[in-house]
Amino acid sequence: MTGELSPIDKAKFVAAKRAADLVEDGMRVGLGTGSTAAWLVRCLGDMVRKEGLKMRGVPTSTRTAQLAREVGIEVITLDEARWLDITIDGADEFDGDLNLIKGGGGALLQEKIVATASDQMVVIADLGKEVSRLGAFPLPVEVIPFGWQTTQALLEETLISMDVLGRTATLRMNGDTPFVTDEGNHILDLHLQRIGNARQLALVLNQIPGVVENGLFIDICDTVVVGHGDGRVEIRDINQGTVEHDRLDFVESDNLFTDLAD
């Protein structure tokens, strides 16, 4: 039941439900990856089944694609869509300029490609994801498997000259083996603690041989929908400079997501 969800899960639910209202008939929608984005996919699936919403989704990972199909969303590829009306995704951190750290779910490469191929990117989050300065959450960097330890050493050497507090890179694991992305790559998590110049860091990291992409999303996000455990929602639009307040009531039948609770 909805009442059994934690305040954080309630916050994710109301943010996802409010963001789903931004999707209109005929839209091509980028579908993010991760626990928060999964709530959004379920909300959209509910609208497809119960309200007849006509939309097509471009998933950013195989597991998002599987979930989208399960809830009745028509799934197409980005090349089939060519361009997207909106992408809705979660974030590991966002700052006051709506710059993001993403990739905690391991899909940062496809997430960034899909987000930049969209007219607008909307992030759904709980208030705990907001930070004054990025960097407390480890920054994911996707690297090719060949020579990943050399790439790791190059990353740590590069960080010496960057405005960050920490400079350790660790290989993300999946049990006893390295985590493998949908594209067959590894992820190195950079433990930076604080990032002084995120824009500069994003550019520098991608110049290192072996690096495919990093999890800094700079000037990509247009709107963040922040959910609260009591049903309050804030919609912050960085382009319009506006903050809209809303409130969603919890109804027990609304909770389609007990299996997604963290």
Curated annotation (Swiss-Prot):
The active site is at E111 (proton acceptor). It comes from the Bacteria. GO terms for cellular component: cytosol. Pathway: Carbohydrate degradation; pentose phosphate pathway; D-ribose 5-phosphate from D-ribulose 5-phosphate (non-oxidative stage): step 1/1. GO terms for molecular function: ribose-5-phosphate isomerase activity. Its EC number is 5.3.1.6. Keywords: Isomerase. One of its GO terms (biological process) is pentose-phosphate shunt, non-oxidative branch. InterPro entries: NagB/RpiA_transferase-like, Ribose5P_isomerase_typA_subgr, Ribose5P_isomerase_type_A. It catalyses: aldehydo-D-ribose 5-phosphate = D-ribulose 5-phosphate. Homodimer. HAMAP family: Rib_5P_isom_A (MF_00170). Catalyzes the reversible conversion of ribose-5-phosphate to ribulose 5-phosphate. NCBIfam families: PRK00702.1 (NF001924), rpiA (TIGR00021). Belongs to the ribose 5-phosphate isomerase family. This is Ribose-5-phosphate isomerase A. It comes from Ruegeria pomeroyi (strain ATCC 700808 / DSM 15171 / DSS-3). The gene is rpiA.
